């Protein structure tokens, strides 16, 4: 059984995999997550969430009932690692129209263009915001516009916009040189 004490250490990839294998054998992935993901010690929460990243797609689907608690965790935590890992799990879960939360959409929109945010968090927020808006084409276009505008202020936004447009099928392009500042006239929408 995995204990709080065991999750307090600094872990390597192999140790995260060992945690996952032990949780898999116990057959209680959702219970493990529910127990440790909101732990007051960020190291414990981080290691628990990291171990669960090793789950297969089918196993990960078991976490669907934790979608909204994971969303709350992502929005409320002060720890960047816990935020990134909770966003990673959210991104792997199904998002239906009934799951759309405007507070979470606002969170994603704010963090995807925040120059002080880590690039991994920015890219996950971009992808999740785009997926949340797929039910509303006008909103989806607005997310793309925000990404384009965010590229003016943040090179990370531009890099991740270029990466994700191929992954999730953005229809718009940003013809920009990576070495010169972009002017508003150089953006095509």
Name every feature range the model reports, one short phrase each.
Residues 172-173, 177-188:
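Low-acidity, Ser/Thr- and Arg-rich intrinsically disordered low-complexity segments
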Residues 1-166, 189:
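Alpha-helical scaffold domains
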